[in-house]
Structures are given as structure tokens and as C-alpha cells.
């Protein structure tokens, strides 16, 4: 999509990305999951394409959100360990807020996810949005004080 015009005629101040999670899906009957280094290579390619097509934009890459314990979560952690390499501190930044989605014991906080334990539910999205408010301010963007129904 990016190469086919999805970013034409726009110039956002900030682009946020949380990508790669769908590449971790495993359907043993159809196909194996992508390897972490291949997922990272895909994320890097998308970030580089966005840098080229949006030369005035800053890009924030979020770590892939945690999963329930198991092989997929091990792959999430492997990809996330590579993501800081993308940050240059000028235009591309890496942000890891995964601790917000974990319990005190380091397990997935199921109350923030839908039944599939992959997609965030309303409370999970509110958690993410709340974490984004200081990030937006840090990058010089104004935040609606009534956003999320909360006052600053």
C-alpha cells in the first residue's frame, strides 16, 4: 500500500506504527509463522519506505504487544529485541509500553484483551491511548484535554 500511493499527498508530523503481530500467527495446517528476523526485516522496510515518502514526519515504532505465554510470545520478544535498532533518535523512535499490558507477575493482563488474547479491548485501547498522550506532547503535538474523557 505504501508503495502504491497510500502516503501520497499527506505530511503528518508524527506517524505511529505497531506492526508485525499478524506475521506471528501460526496456522499449522496452512503455513508456519514468519521467523523473527524476517518480521524485523519487513518492519525495517516499512519504516524506511515511510522515511523516504514522509521526509518531514517523525516515526514512532511501538514494540509488538505481548501475547499469552507460548511460542508466539517468544517470537514477539525476539522481534521486540531487534526493534531498538530502527531508532535514530532524530526521526525514528522506538517505544516499548508492553509493561502496561502485563500483570505484576509479568503475565498477560487478560482484562485488557479480547477473548482471542491478541486484540485489545476497549480498556486496552484506553491504556494505549493514555500512554500515547505524553508521547504526543513530547513530539510537540497538542493533545485535546478532553480526549479519552479525562482531564490532564
What do these predicted ranges mean?
Residues 18-24, 47-79, 98-99:
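Active-site segments of SGNH/GDSL-like serine hydrolases
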Amino acid at each position: 500500500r505504501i508503495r502504491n500511493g497510500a502516503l501520497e499527498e499527506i505530511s503528518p508530523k508524527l506517524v505511529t506504527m505497531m506492526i508485525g503481530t499478524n506475521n506471528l500467527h501460526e496456522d499449522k495446517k496452512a503455513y508456519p509463522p514468519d521467523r523473527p528476523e524476517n518480521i524485523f526485516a519487513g518492519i525495517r522496510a516499512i519504516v524506511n519506505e515511510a522515511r523516504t515518502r514522509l521526509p518531514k514526519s517523525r516515526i514512532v515504532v511501538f514494540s509488538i504487544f505481548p501475547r499469552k505465554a507460548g511460542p508466539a510470545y517468544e517470537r514477539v520478544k525476539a522481534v521486540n529485541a531487534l526493534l531498538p535498532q530502527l531508532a535514530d533518535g532524530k526521526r525514528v523512535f522506538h517505544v516499548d509500553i508492553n509493561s502496561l499490558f502485563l500483570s505484576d507477575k509479568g503475565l498477560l493482563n487478560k482484562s485488557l484483551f479480547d477473548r482471542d488474547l491478541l486484540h485489545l479491548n476497549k480498556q486496552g485501547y484506553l491504556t494505549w491511548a493514555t500512554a500515547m498522550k505524553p508521547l504526543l506532547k513530547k513530539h510537540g503535538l497538542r493533545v485535546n484535554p478532553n480526549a479519552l474523557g479525562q482531564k490532564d
